[in-house]
A protein has these predicted regions:
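Walker A/P-loop nucleotide-binding motif
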Residues: 10-32, 49
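Short regulatory helix/loop adjacent to the ATP-binding pocket of P-loop NTPases
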Residues: 33-36, 136-151, 160
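Conserved catalytic segments around the Walker B and adjacent sensor/switch elements
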Residues: 38-48
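Conserved NTP-binding/hydrolysis module of P-loop NTPases
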Residues: 41, 51-70
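Conserved AAA+ ATPase "sensor/coupling" helix adjacent to the nucleotide-binding pocket
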Residues: 62-65, 134-135, 143, 161-180
Length: 273
């Protein structure tokens, strides 16, 4: 989060965030946009990546409140250029966030690179945040996009949680839900280890498995969630088959802390509820 915030606030231009499905990329971006909400920043959030270069420019211009309908690519570029220079003169920051950016065509990524040419001697007029899965890394490493790759000022990768981070995430979410301190016993260490074994620390799966396990335990009038209920939930969610194809990462222990990400995700969901 700190790296993304720094990249935007310091107007570094291109920033890339990658991670596997369900690791919390989109929620992390939502938290970032909330942090930027009161900092003279306006953003366009692009969700649909199956766009042509003209459609992308049209979408971005519309998100920034510009009249875009029926205009040519040249006209859209002129309008965006004037808009960005005007905001820069007022010391305002403009951001384009592209979600699922691995789906962008080479043509559109090149168009985005050309947008980054709009700059002063010291700063980029447009901050571009590319968010995507592992395939985005592969695409950025391709020969066709070597110029774009060189312009990326910051590049971050979001890993799944390790066991300790999974434990912290579960307990943090229990606190956010209003559970008393003794509610830690709802998920004993053995149960959390079972959750981790089935989910491999993927935040979305951790949340889904825990929610379903709590419902199952409640239906059986249990005061805590035993490991066998987690096993049953994992079976119902077809996670056992998933784990057979992708062996458990129980021995994986990374140096990057995902706990802060978990807290951001949990706080975001709590704020949304």
């Amino acid at each position: 989060m700190a790296a993304l915030y720094y990249g935007v606030q310091r107007r570094k231009g291109f920033v890339a965030l990658t991670g596997d499905v369900g690791t919390g990329k989109t929620l992390l971006i939502r938290c970032l946009l909330r942090m930027l909400k009161n900092s003279n920043t306006v953003w366009a959030h692009v969700f649909n990546c199956r766009l042509s270069s003209l459609e992308f420019l049209d979408y971005a211009a519309t998100e920034f409140g510009l009249a875009a309908s029926g205009k040519t690519k040249g006209q859209l570029l002129q309008d965006l250029s004037k808009y960005l220079f005007s905001r820069h003169q007022r010391k305002l920051t403009t951001v384009i966030v592209v979600d699922d950016a691995q789906g962008l065509s080479i043509e559109v990524l090149e168009e985005i690179r050309l947008l980054s040419n709009l700059e002063t001697e010291t700063e980029k007029l447009l901050q571009i945040l590319l968010v995507g899965q592992h395939e985005l890394d592969e695409k950025l490493d391709s020969f066709e996009l070597r110029q774009l790759k060189q312009r990326i000022a910051l590049r971050s990768h979001l890993e799944p949680f390790n066991l300790e981070e999974t434990r912290s995430c579960i307990r943090h979410r229990l606190r956010c839900a209003g559970a008393p301190s003794e509610a830690h016993d709802l998920f004993a260490d053995e149960t959390i280890e079972t959750v981790f074994r089935h989910t491999r620390g993927v935040a979305r799966l951790v949340n889904t498995v825990c929610e379903n396990a709590l419902i199952a335990a409640f239906a059986r009038q249990l005061t805590r969630v035993p490991p066998d209920i987690v096993d049953e939930v994992a079976y119902d969610l077809r996670l056992l088959r998933l784990n057979a194809a992708n062996p458990s990462r129980a021995e994986y222990d990374k140096s990057n802390s995902g706990t802060a990400t978990c807290i951001s995700i949990a706080d975001s969901r709590t704020a949304d509820s």
